Amino acid sequence: MVAEDAPVRGTCRVLFRTTTLIFLCTLLALSISILYESLIIQKQIMSQAGSTGSNFRLGSITDLLNNILSVANQIIYNSAVALPLQLDTLESTLLTAIKSLQTSDKLEQNCSWGAALINDNRYINGINQFYFSIAEGRNLTLGPLLNIPSFIPTATTPEGCTRIPSFSLTKTHWCYTHNVILNGCQDHVSSNQFVSMGIIEPTSAGFPSFRTLKTLYLSDGVNRKSCSISTVPGGCMMYCFVSTQPERDDYLSTAPPEQRIIIMYYNDTIVERIINPPGVLDVWATLNPGTGSGVYYLGWVLFPTYGGVIKDTSLWNNQANKYFIPQMVAALCSQNQATQVQNAKSSYYSSWFGNRMIQSGILACPLQQDLTNECLILPFSNDQVLMGAEGRLYMYGDSVYYYQRSNSWWPMTMLYKVTITFTNGQPSAISAQNVPTQQVPRPGTGDCSATNRCPGFCLKGVYADAWLLTNPSSTSTFGSEATFTGSYLNAATQRINPTMYIANNTQIISSQQFGSSGQEAAYGHTTCFRDTGSVMVYCIYIIELSSSLLGQFQIVPFIRQVTLS
């Protein structure tokens, strides 16, 4: 219930503050008008009866204006400071009370203790925020690894494989999923899906642990792939596609694979729907979830998506000649401007994938059970983002951000602030603003290695999202200084040396490599949160690590504290 009200509360704040600004502008106009009239009256009185009476009347008018301005200042303080603090306090109090009611009382005689799907109140108000100022971001370090029980199961045979994790966290709870392959790591033949939900609780040592309250194992013969998960009020929503052919064959097809939405509630209710978003058939050859988590926003669940667009369709023609070159490239690439533009334009089209245009976007679904034709596809404009790739959506306060995997020629971490336009209560368009950075590189081969800085066609890279620790909007120029954390593979061409880091736009500030040199790894997901009791910031780094004992990969959650030095 609280998660549903949070976006509405944010909208009400905006409306209230807008009304307040209009009221203040009206007061200012009236004040200027009164002052102007008083000056005219003063001149008339001075010319007729001297200055004594006029000074008295002017003083009365000045007192009146001071009273008006005093009221206006109080309104500004209440709307900008007092009211938001009161709302946050009330929300925290309500969530804490709900958790207390559901965990401290037995339902009836001899019943077991209840278990509410609500994080411990130490963390409720420390989730999905920017945690440090711009100045503090320059002095952050990674703490040591903290020993917690893993909430992620591993393969139990040498032939098995667990891959493609997706993790989502909100004020109330977390959701997690990964793919389970019984033999090898190729997911296009047969695989199952593990899903869990739970809460964050403190340990006796003071740091957090992740308690699993519900699990689900989807093993019904349906080959769900690349699933992206999002927390929703009371449970989890998951977006998957179904395919039993290699990725290249998906792109060479003329009809997109089956798209599915699965809603799992804490009360064991499960709803699964095959969705048919308008504008997909005959436009997209394939449409894939971004694997990274989605977000719940203004009554809609948003998921990252990408795929191949068919030539000469309306979407293809609308994106023609559009391209995006990150801001940092100008000082780092030796190509002339014309060559950069030409290569950047061609980077969105892949001959390997049947000359499809590789496009990123957002799948938006209302939170309801009848989803067959209700979900919408919102493509990004290609003059704002790079070639389509896996991705993740974040909520920082009321703002939506997007991570795009660096599959294309620019090997650095790609983060964007997203603006979503609503028309008649539905999301109708999206735009993206890039956070400029020349860190942190991903590995690739040939001309697409971690050292590449110039536009060209690439289809490389690895998923390695990052968490913003400072607000890019806090600087006079958006994103001119931003600090973020994550994990990356510290090598130019190979998927080896998993390393957790803190970085800003131009340099890595702090880093810790896991394992010995040459340790193989793959995908990495990072999420941070704050313990509002101790004011400590913790980050969970979920990394796919190669294993010589059980399966080709094991998915391991690492927790570290981010400290201000």
UniProtKB/Swiss-Prot annotation:
Q: What is its EC number?
A: 3.2.1.18
Q: Where in the cell is it found?
A: Virion membrane; Host cell membrane
Q: Kindly indicate where the leader peptide sits in this chain.
A: none
Q: Which GO terms describe its molecular function?
A: exo-alpha-sialidase activity; host cell surface receptor binding
Q: What is the recorded membrane topology of this protein?
A: Single-pass type II membrane protein
Query: Which Gene3D superfamilies does this entry report, sorted A to Z?
Result: 1.20.5.110, 2.120.10.10
Q: Which reaction does it catalyse?
A: Hydrolysis of alpha-(2->3)-, alpha-(2->6)-, alpha-(2->8)- glycosidic linkages of terminal sialic acid residues in oligosaccharides, glycoproteins, glycolipids, colominic acid and synthetic substrates
- Membrane topology (Virion surface): 42-565
Ranges where the record places region Involved in neuraminidase activity: 223-228
State what this protein does. Answer: Attaches the virus to sialic acid-containing cell receptors and thereby initiating infection. Binding of HN protein to the receptor induces a conformational change that allows the F protein to trigger virion/cell membranes fusion.
- Protein name per the record: Hemagglutinin-neuraminidase
Gene that produces this protein: HN
